From Swiss-Prot:
Any one GO molecular function term: toxin activity
Site (Putative interfacial binding surface (IBS)): 18-19, 23, 26, 33-34, 38-39, 76, 119
Co-factor requirement: Ca(2+)
Protein name, per record: Phospholipase A2 crotoxin basic chain CBa2
Organism: Crotalus durissus terrificus (South American rattlesnake)
Cofactor comment text: Binds 1 Ca(2+) ion.
Source superkingdom: Eukaryota
Catalytic reaction equation(s): a 1,2-diacyl-sn-glycero-3-phosphocholine + H2O = a 1-acyl-sn-glycero-3-phosphocholine + a fatty acid + H(+)
Keywords: Blood coagulation cascade inhibiting toxin, Calcium, Disulfide bond, Hemostasis impairing toxin, Hydrolase, Ion channel impairing toxin, Lipid degradation, Lipid metabolism, Metal-binding, Neurotoxin, Pharmaceutical, Presynaptic neurotoxin, Secreted, Signal, Toxin
Localization per Swiss-Prot or TrEMBL: Secreted
């Protein structure tokens, strides 16, 4: 499943919140989502299970929970309005779904920035098979 996320982000001309989320991550962390976050820990990338491995992985867990509350929204592909100015991400006006998706992405990107000091290369391409602990609830 995670492979689908990376393919989606790499496709030329891809639009939607996955690409927008990638831009937010780059803005906040100065790192590309691929390869730094696409397969990180148990929750960064598509899907997730087990327990978050560290603060970075917890940002992705919380992001998954945020998207989980938006089950009726098209979280992966809905294009929303936002701006990157003066060091801040600001979500713009749109439908309720688009505004909420943007907020989920903004909060996660800011969380990843705050967690940069705890980023561990050992979790960069972490195999799903090592995420066997019982999952936390949102």
């Amino acid at each position: 499943m995670r492979a689908l996320w990376i393919v989606a982000v790499l496709l030329v001309g891809v639009e939607g919140s996955l690409l927008q989320f990638n831009k937010m991550i780059k803005f906040e962390t100065r790192k590309n989502a691929v390869p730094f976050y696409a397969f990180y820990g148990c929750y960064c990338g598509w899907g997730g299970q087990g327990r978050p491995k560290d603060a970075t992985d917890r940002c992705c867990f919380v992001h998954d929970c945020c998207y989980g509350k938006l089950a009726k929204c098209n979280t992966k592909w809905d294009i929303y309005r936002y701006s990157l100015k003066s060091g801040y991400i600001t979500c713009g006006k749109g439908t309720w779904c688009k505004e909420q998706i943007c907020e989920c992405d903004r909060v996660a990107a800011e969380c990843l920035r705050r967690s940069l000091s705890t980023y561990k290369n050992e979790y960069m391409f972490y195999p799903d098979s090592r995420c066997r602990e019982p999952s936390e609830t949102c």
